[in-house]
């Protein structure tokens, strides 16, 4: 989940892992271009939170994509400045 959403300029991404996993957490714009990698590391099972500060980006819709093990999750978020 992402809270707050819409956000300005930062939001917190919450996710849970059922087992230890390598996590890749990336943000893409509506054109499909990757704008940042927030994580590309091993994480232990459990609940985690990461803060994304988007102060250098333009207002718009962004997609946060979480890849953990063989699972993918996508969350749409809106940056309003």
Where are these regions (language model features)?
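C-terminal outer-membrane/trafficking sorting elements
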Residues: 1-3, 7-81
